[in-house]
UniProtKB/Swiss-Prot annotation:
InterPro entries: Beta-defensin (IPR050544), Beta_defensin_dom (IPR025933). The keyword Transferase does not apply. The gene is DEFB128. Keywords: Antibiotic, Antimicrobial, Defensin, Disulfide bond, Secreted, Signal. This is Beta-defensin 128. It comes from the Eukaryota. It is found in: Secreted. The lineage of its organism: Eukaryota, Metazoa, Chordata, Craniata, Vertebrata. Belongs to the beta-defensin family.
Amino acid sequence: MKLFLVLIILLFEVLTDGARLKKCFNKVTGYCRKKCKVGERYEIGCLSGKLCCANDEEEKKHVSFKKPHQHSGEKLSVLQDYIILPTITIFTV
């Protein structure tokens, strides 16, 4: 019975760092660690006093969004923004 109570108490124990690493803030794709791994670079400090380690390989995977080309001379009319499709209703039959 005592062992059962100890197991129940351990289930509700909240770990400070847990199994999952905390992510950095300020749009940095990295994790807060005490020491950075090989191939990672130090960006900024985390709130817990650890280093924000960002992986160069991960940042190369993310491609920045490019805005579509805007026509400077001509303006598109409202009619060209959408197409009216023919529909069949009860009243047209």
